[in-house]
Structures are given as C-alpha cells and as structure tokens.
Swiss-Prot record:
Sequence intervals crossing the membrane: 4-24, 28-48, 72-92, 96-116, 129-149, 169-189, 200-220, 241-261, 266-286, 294-314, 342-362
A Pfam family hit: MraY_sig1
Gene Ontology, cellular component aspect: plasma membrane
Function text: Catalyzes the initial step of the lipid cycle reactions in the biosynthesis of the cell wall peptidoglycan: transfers peptidoglycan precursor phospho-MurNAc-pentapeptide from UDP-MurNAc-pentapeptide onto the lipid carrier undecaprenyl phosphate, yielding undecaprenyl-pyrophosphoryl-MurNAc-pentapeptide, known as lipid I.
Family: Belongs to the glycosyltransferase 4 family. MraY subfamily.
Catalytic activity: UDP-N-acetyl-alpha-D-muramoyl-L-alanyl-gamma-D-glutamyl-meso-2,6-diaminopimeloyl-D-alanyl-D-alanine + di-trans,octa-cis-undecaprenyl phosphate = di-trans,octa-cis-undecaprenyl diphospho-N-acetyl-alpha-D-muramoyl-L-alanyl-D-glutamyl-meso-2,6-diaminopimeloyl-D-alanyl-D-alanine + UMP
Membrane topology label: Multi-pass membrane protein
Protein name as it appears in the record: Phospho-N-acetylmuramoyl-pentapeptide-transferase
Pathway: Cell wall biogenesis; peptidoglycan biosynthesis
Gene that this sequence comes from: mraY
Cofactor: Mg(2+)
Enzyme Commission number(s) from the entry: 2.7.8.13
UniProt entry keywords in alphabetical sequence: Cell cycle, Cell division, Cell inner membrane, Cell membrane, Cell shape, Cell wall biogenesis/degradation, Magnesium, Membrane, Metal-binding, Peptidoglycan synthesis, Transferase, Transmembrane, Transmembrane helix
Superkingdom: Bacteria
Length: 363
C-alpha cells in the first residue's frame, strides 16, 4: 500500500523513485517485519503465560529433556504471519497477483494451524485436528492457489518443470502439473511442520530457504537484464515482488528467533510452521523452482522422509523401527545428542543444501 501510494506521487517528489527498486523495498521489509515481530512476541508471551491453559502440550513419549518445556507458550507464529502480511502489503505491490495468492495461501494455512494449535492446548493433547480434515483443508487451499498461479503464468512455461543440473532441460507435465504442484505445496507445509520440534530448529532453515527463493524470484523477473542463457531459470514476469515477501519472512523469522533459541520462551506452533511451509511451496511453484526447493530445503525433505519411513516400517514390517524416534531430530536426541548440538548441525546442513541449490542455477 505504501509502495503504491509513493509510486503514484513520484512526479511530485523524485526521492520516491527509489521505491521502484525491489532490493531497497526488500531491505526495508526485513527491518520492518523484524521490528513488528520482535515487539509483538513479548506481548504474546505475556498473554499466553497469563492464560496458562494455552501452553504447549508435551508428548509423553518424547525425550525426557522436553519435560522441562511444559508450560512454554505456543502459537508464536501469529506474530510472524502478522508481521509478514503487514510488511508485504506496505512495501510490495498489493495488486500483484502472485503476492496476493501467496498471502491468501499463507493466511489460510495459518488459520488452519491456529485451529489445530487451539485444539491441542485446550484439550491438552498433541493430536489437534483430525489428520484427514487437515489434509483436505490443505488440498483445498493448494488447489485454489495452483489454479490462480497456473492461469496467470505465461502459457509457455505454466506447466513446465526445470530439472536442476541439466542445462536447459525442462519437462512439460501438461495435465499432471497441477497434481505435482499440489504435492509440492502440501509436502512443503507438512515437512516444515515436522521439522519444528526443537528450539530454533526450523527458524533458521526457513530464513535460508526464503533468502534463496527471494533471490531466484528476483532473477526470474529480471531475466531481460541478466544473461539468462547462463542461468537455469525461467522468465516469470512480476515475480520479483515476491522478493519483498521473502524478505518479510526473513525479518519476521529473525524477530521470532530471538525468543525461540534454546531455551525457547515461545514456540512457533502449527499456525507458523504450516503457513510458512505452505508459503515457500507456493513461491517455488510461482517462480518455477519446484524441484530446486527440494534441494535448498533438503533438511525439510530429510525430516519428512524419516517420518514416512518410520510409519511404513512400523505398519508393514511387524512394528520394526528404522529410527529410535521420528522425525529424525528426535532420533539423535534418543542416542544422546544434546539439543544445541542437533540444532547447530542441522543449521549447517541447511546452509550446505542451500549452496547446492543455488549452484544449480549456473551448473
């Protein structure tokens, strides 16, 4: 809104022209979303501590160190999502269909996560919403987002899929693209949700992935100014406005991380993890970086696969467990790794995956 207002008055004040620059607005978005998130979270902590029945329930089967976390407030994702939306609407072009679609998807999944969190804390169990109802809701939101994106993308690339590390190789999935895009968005949402199990664990990877996606959105939109022949990327007009949104995610997550580093004063909750995971999934679909998301977000993939493998192993191999506990970060807890050691190692893995993903732009 602020961006649109200032641009409309560019003739009366030349200095407003700097707001044409996506990089300038992205930098401001980081600072603004950080400030809002950093300021709002202490208020949430105070409020949720006052209402003690809104504390995070702890699984009885979890590591014994988690018992000390009983009573820690949850639903900190409220502050993150609020900060992102306010910053994005102020500094991005709010008429941009890709921005609006991502905000719609993120907000819808945040509401779903909020309902899930509320059921968990009020009923004092870790199950929340029925899994089938949650999945159906995610599918409905994802279908709407995919249809909007597919309709607005250039028809020459709408159903195309980039294969990283294979120069100029794209595959036209045709009618199978929408189901594939649904898998990316829903999978991303749930994978991030599964990763959110230790203090600070999911926040830094979200920041790293958002940075990579923001960069790729900028490159995708500015292909005419870059020697696109040397980059494995498709030209997506108006995608650079999503760089502002990605920057807002970075800033809001940094503000949250201040209070979420061990020992955490507040947890993100499903309201944050489901929506942020969904947002990066939607952005990857818009910018045509679906497979590349699986690389830069490799940590999320590993966490999700470990949970899937464990479930199928128990169900079809006579109760045999591949891991001591899933997702995999809990496995490392069970074999004696400290929480800080697991988190720091997983952060390093996330950095490595992001570097591999970015290298696929030029290799």
């Amino acid at each position: 809104m602020l961006y649109n207002l200032l641009v409309s008055h560019i003739n009366s004040c030349y200095i407003f022209s700097i707001f044409y620059n996506v990089i300038v607005r992205s930098g401001i978005a980081i600072l603004l979303s950080f400030s809002i998130s950093f300021s709002l979270i202490p208020i949430l902590i105070k409020y949720f501590k006052y209402w003690k029945n809104l504390a995070q329930p702890i699984r009885n089967l979890g590591h014994k160190s988690h018992i000390a976390k009983a009573g820690t407030p949850t639903m900190g994702g409220i502050a993150i999502i609020f900060s992102i939306i306010i910053s994005t609407l102020m500094l991005a072009d709010y008429k941009n269909i890709y921005v609006l679609t991502t905000i719609f998807g993120m907000l819808s999944l945040a509401i779903l996560g909020l309902i899930d969190d509320y059921q968990k804390v009020t009923k004092k169990n870790t199950k929340g919403i029925n899994a089938t109802c949650k999945l159906i809701s995610q599918i409905m939101v994802s279908i709407i987002c995919c249809m909007i994106v597919n309709y607005n993308l250039n028809s020459e690339i709408a159903n195309h899929l980039i294969i990283p590390f294979f120069k100029k190789l794209t595959i036209d999935l045709s009618i199978f693209y929408i189901p594939f895009a649904l898998f990316i968005i829903i999978g991303s949402s749930n994978a991030v949700n599964l990763t959110d199990g230790l203090d600070g664990l999911v926040t830094v990877p979200i920041i790293i992935v958002s940075f990579c996606l923001g960069l790729m959105c900028y490159l995708a939109d500015n292909a005419q100014y870059i020697n696109i022949n040397h980059l494995q990327i498709l030209h997506v007009q108006q995608a650079s406005e999503l760089t502002v949104l990605c920057s807002a995610i970075i800033g809001a997550s940094l503000g949250f991380l201040w209070y979420n580093i061990q020992p955490a004063k507040i947890f993100m909750g499903d309201v944050g993890s489901l929506s942020l995971g969904g947002a990066i999934g939607i952005i990857s679909v818009i910018s045509k970086n679906e497979i590349r998301l699986g690389i830069i977000g490799g940590l999320f993939v590993i966490e999700a696969l470990s949970a899937i493998i464990q479930i199928y192993s128990i169900r079809y191999l006579g109760g045999k467990r591949v891991f001591k506990m899933a997702p995999i970060h809990h496995h490392f807890e069970q074999i004696g790794w400290s929480e800080s050691k697991i988190v720091s190692r997983f952060w390093l893995l996330s950095i490595i995956f992001s570097l591999i993903g970015l290298s696929s732009l030029i290799l």
